[in-house]
């Protein structure tokens, strides 16, 4: 099952995340199927490729709870 989830990168104590599509059984920093954005919780900077996200969600990809909240804040998902 494919999931839309966060992949950590950055330095120690300075996390930054990429929004990626990957198998649910793949480890957190494993190889993604596709990268659709990024999020930096320290600077609150984020970018989401709306076209790719909508495409993957239409294919049935499930976002994790954290990613769902991020997309809801950026008005990409309506409840």
Swiss-Prot record:
Pfam entry (one): Ribosomal_S16
Q: Which PANTHER family match?
A: 30S RIBOSOMAL PROTEIN S16, SMALL RIBOSOMAL SUBUNIT PROTEIN BS16M
Gene this chain is encoded by = rps16
Of which family is this protein a member? Belongs to the bacterial ribosomal protein bS16 family.
User: In which organism is this protein found?
Assistant: Thalassiosira pseudonana
GO molecular function annotation: structural constituent of ribosome
**UniProt keyword annotation of Metal-binding present:** no
According to UniProt, the name of this protein is Small ribosomal subunit protein bS16c
Keyword line:
Chloroplast, Plastid, Ribonucleoprotein, Ribosomal protein
Q: Which GO terms describe its biological process?
A: translation
Q: What compartments host this protein? A: Plastid, Chloroplast
GO cellular component labels: chloroplast; small ribosomal subunit
């Amino acid at each position: 099952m494919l999931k839309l989830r966060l992949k950590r990168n950055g330095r120690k104590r300075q996390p930054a995340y990429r929004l990626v599509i990957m198998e649910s059984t793949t480890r957190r920093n494993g190889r993604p199927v596709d990268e659709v954005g990024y999020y930096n919780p320290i600077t609150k900077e984020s970018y989401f490729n709306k076209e790719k996200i909508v495409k993957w969600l239409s294919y049935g990809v499930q976002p994790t709870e954290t990613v769902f909240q991020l997309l809801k804040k950026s008005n990409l998902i309506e409840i």
